[in-house]
């Protein structure tokens, strides 16, 4: 007599977002990120762009232009980090306000 293993239900790795979309797909995650924190992907793209232009300038031997683009990269990175920190604080503030609305009687 062969033993049968119990049937295990599948594990759901992520919960649907407020809009009902599943965030496991890349396009869903990107849409969610652009909607909630649009400055972060823009800052990342600016950082990568500045780095690529600096690399191109180095290959062409234009060190002054390369240094200028490296400075732009640093500024773009700083702006991205500030956007991340600001987003974290805003998210925390929104959660606290939502919690206070639930606690406070009307």
UniProtKB/Swiss-Prot annotation:
Q: Report the sequence similarity comment from the record.
A: Belongs to the RCF1 family.
Q: Which domain of life is it from?
A: Eukaryota
Key words, A-Z = Membrane, Mitochondrion, Transmembrane, Transmembrane helix
Quaternary structure per UniProt?
Answer: Associates with the respiratory chain complex III/complex IV supercomplex.
| Membrane topology classification | Multi-pass membrane protein
What is its subcellular localisation? Mitochondrion membrane
Q: PROSITE patterns attached here? A: HIG1
HIG1 domain: residues covered: 9-102
Q: Know the name of this protein?
A: Respiratory supercomplex factor 1, mitochondrial
Q: What does this protein do?
A: Cytochrome c oxidase subunit which plays a role in assembly of respiratory supercomplexes.
- Transmembrane helix as a keyword? yes
Region of interest (Disordered), ranges: 1-28
Q: Please list every transmembrane segment annotated in the UniProt record, as residue ranges.
A: 39-58, 73-90
Chain intervals with Polar residues compositional bias: 16-27
Task: Choose one Gene Ontology CC annotation of this protein and give it.
Answer: mitochondrial membrane
């Amino acid at each position: 007599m062969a033993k049968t293993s119990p049937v295990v239900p599948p594990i759901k790795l992520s919960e649907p977002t407020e809009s009902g979309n599943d965030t496991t797909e890349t396009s869903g995650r990107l849409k969610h990120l652009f909607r909630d924190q649009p400055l972060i992907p823009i800052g990342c793209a600016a950082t990568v762009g500045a780095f690529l232009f600096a690399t191109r300038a180095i290959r062409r031997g234009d060190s002054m232009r390369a240094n200028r683009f490296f400075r732009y990269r640093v500024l773009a990175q700083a702006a991205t980090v500030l956007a991340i920190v600001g987003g974290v604080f805003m998210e925390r503030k929104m959660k606290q306000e939502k919690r206070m609305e639930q606690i406070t009687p009307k």
